[in-house]
Amino acid sequence: MSLVLEVKTKNYLDDLLSIKKSLSHMETIVEEYNGYVLSESELKFGWTFFKLAFKPNLQNGIKEKFSDMLNKYPSSDQSQKFAKFMIDYFQSRGCAAIIKAND
């Protein structure tokens, strides 16, 4: 099953660009392209919300390439480990959006 992250931001254009650049970099590292889908954005109360869904090819490529790092996350749930890894990755690349795993 593909992971879906929920994203909320007050600076949609900057954070969207940051996420797209980060994902492009990740796709290059794992050599899997067109590996994600972004939903339409929705504006509520000054926040912009959208979802980021990973396609299996990119998700599996990341899991294989970064398995040692993913295993360091304390959760026994593999999808939660992957979500936390990606959230940390986006933050390390300068993304200021609030990101959480879709429950």
Predicted regions located by residue number:
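Ser/Thr- (and often Asn-) enriched beta-sheet segments in non-cytosolic proteins
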Residues: V4-K8, K51-A53, I98-K100
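Extended Gly/Ser/Thr-rich low-complexity repeat segments
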Residues: L17-H25, N60-F85, C95
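Short secondary-structure junctions
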Residues: E27-Y36, F90-C95
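Short, intrinsically disordered low-complexity segments
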Residues: E31-S76
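Mixed-charge, Lys/Arg-enriched low-complexity segments
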Residues: K84-D103
